[in-house]
């Protein structure tokens, strides 16, 4: 909205031409989302407390988590509000890719909201049954991928580029939608599994989103993409602003989600933000780079898969003390803040490795 207004004023006031630049609007978008999060956070927390929407704690989990019972959750609504407001203000709303990414994010947030609502308000301990959650995630992903694949306004490259190798590519052809589907749904669920400690998931989300914003910026520019050896994907520059909005909204949420947390994001936040990372990576054709930068999410997911598989194969034995992996380290005696910060450090390394693929080819 404000971007459209500045476009009208450019003819009379040359100073407004600065709003043409993605970098400038990205900064404003991030600051806007941050301010919305910081200002609305206390109101959201009080509102959730008034509704008695508090976190339920696993009885078989670390004993230190018992004190978290009753902490307001569904705070992901605040994150999505900040992202949406920021994008509506500073993005060029004529870009189809922006609406695709934003709608996928909000749709997955709706699935998470229903799950949280059933668990916390209706007191249904199972929430939204897993098969239905996966069904609706799949529907959203398939609709998005189909639109991306067949819509002429979003030219899709079916080539999968290998990170660190300039000339190694695989043309997926009709299998592109399959890969894209698994990236979106897998990313959504991986972030959901990681969101188990105060601030553990949101900071890696912020870091990965910021890095994806760099890729979106480079991919939307023919000169930069050719120089860096990455796919050129036109009409995707506004995704830089979308990613910047995630950064700002995430930092605003972290203000209240840092240890000891005043609010949790819930499935409404984790499913939405995970899907956001996935769909952005698909649109800018950086699926394998997302696998690198989101290495923490991958490790957490693999720990659950290995734990379940080993438990069934061994007849009841466990590979880890508890899954996901962050609980394993808690039960080994690590304090919660130590687990969180060390996992953040791991994410910094993964994100730097992902960014290194821009130049090391």
Swiss-Prot record:
TM region(s), chain numbering: 27-47, 70-90, 97-117, 134-154, 167-187, 199-219, 236-256, 263-283, 288-308, 338-358
Cellular location(s): Cell inner membrane
Keyword Magnesium: yes
Cofactor(s) the record lists: Mg(2+)
EC code: 2.7.8.13
Keyword Cell division among UniProt keywords: yes
Topology relative to the membrane: Multi-pass membrane protein
Top EC class of this enzyme: transferase
GO cellular component: plasma membrane
InterPro entries named in the record: Glycosyl_transferase_4 (IPR000715), PNAcMuramoyl-5peptid_Trfase (IPR003524), PNAcMuramoyl-5peptid_Trfase_CS (IPR018480)
One of the record's GO molecular function terms: UDP-N-acetylmuramoyl-L-alanyl-D-glutamyl-meso-2,6-diaminopimelyl-D-alanyl-D-alanine:undecaprenyl-phosphate transferase activity
GO biological process: cell division; cell wall organization; peptidoglycan biosynthetic process; regulation of cell shape
Catalytic reactions of this protein: UDP-N-acetyl-alpha-D-muramoyl-L-alanyl-gamma-D-glutamyl-meso-2,6-diaminopimeloyl-D-alanyl-D-alanine + di-trans,octa-cis-undecaprenyl phosphate = di-trans,octa-cis-undecaprenyl diphospho-N-acetyl-alpha-D-muramoyl-L-alanyl-D-glutamyl-meso-2,6-diaminopimeloyl-D-alanyl-D-alanine + UMP
Pathway(s) the chain acts in: Cell wall biogenesis; peptidoglycan biosynthesis
NCBIfam families from the UniProt entry: mraY
Function: Catalyzes the initial step of the lipid cycle reactions in the biosynthesis of the cell wall peptidoglycan: transfers peptidoglycan precursor phospho-MurNAc-pentapeptide from UDP-MurNAc-pentapeptide onto the lipid carrier undecaprenyl phosphate, yielding undecaprenyl-pyrophosphoryl-MurNAc-pentapeptide, known as lipid I.
Protein name: Phospho-N-acetylmuramoyl-pentapeptide-transferase
Organism encoding this protein: Legionella pneumophila (strain Lens)
Lineage of producing organism: Bacteria, Pseudomonadati, Pseudomonadota, Gammaproteobacteria, Legionellales
Gene that specifies this protein: mraY
């Amino acid at each position: 909205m404000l971007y459209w207004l500045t476009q009208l004023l450019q003819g009379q006031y040359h100073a407004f031409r600065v709003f043409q630049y993605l970098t400038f609007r990205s900064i404003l978008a991030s600051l806007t989302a941050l301010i919305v999060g910081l200002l609305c956070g206390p109101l959201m927390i009080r509102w959730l407390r008034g509704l008695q929407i508090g976190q339920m704690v696993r009885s078989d989990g670390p004993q230190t988590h018992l004190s978290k019972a009753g902490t307001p959750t569904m705070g992901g609504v605040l994150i999505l509000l900040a992202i949406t407001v920021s994008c509506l203000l500073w993005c060029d709303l004529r870009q189809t890719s922006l609406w695709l990414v934003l709608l996928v994010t909000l749709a997955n947030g709706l699935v998470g909201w229903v799950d949280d609502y059933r668990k916390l308000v209706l007191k249904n301990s199972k929430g939204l049954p897993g098969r239905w959650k996966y069904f609706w995630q799949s529907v959203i992903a398939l609709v998005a991928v189909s639109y991306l694949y067949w819509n002429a306004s979003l030219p899709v490259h079916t080539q999968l580029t290998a990170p660190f190798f300039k000339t190694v590519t695989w043309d997926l052809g009709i299998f592109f939608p399959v890969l894209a589907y698994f990236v979106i749904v897998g990313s959504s669920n991986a972030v959901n599994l990681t969101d188990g400690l105060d601030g553990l998931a949101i900071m890696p989300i912020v870091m990965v989103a910021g890095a994806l914003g760099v890729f979106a910026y480079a991919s939307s520019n023919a000169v930069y993409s050719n120089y860096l050896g990455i796919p050129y994907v036109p009409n995707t520059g506004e995704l830089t602003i979308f990613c910047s909005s995630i950064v700002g909204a995430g930092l605003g949420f972290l203000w209240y989600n840092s240890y000891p947390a005043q609010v949790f994001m819930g499935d409404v936040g984790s499913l939405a933000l995970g899907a956001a990372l996935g769909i952005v990576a698909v649109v800018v054709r950086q699926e394998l780079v997302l696998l690198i930068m989101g290495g923490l999410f991958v490790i957490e997911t693999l720990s659950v898969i290995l734990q379940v598989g080993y438990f069934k194969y061994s007849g009841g034995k466990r590979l880890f003390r508890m899954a996901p992996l962050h609980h394993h380290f808690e039960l080994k005696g690590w304090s919660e803040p130590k687990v969180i910060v060390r996992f953040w450090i791991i994410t910094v390394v993964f994100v730097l490795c992902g960014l290194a693929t821009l130049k090391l080819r």
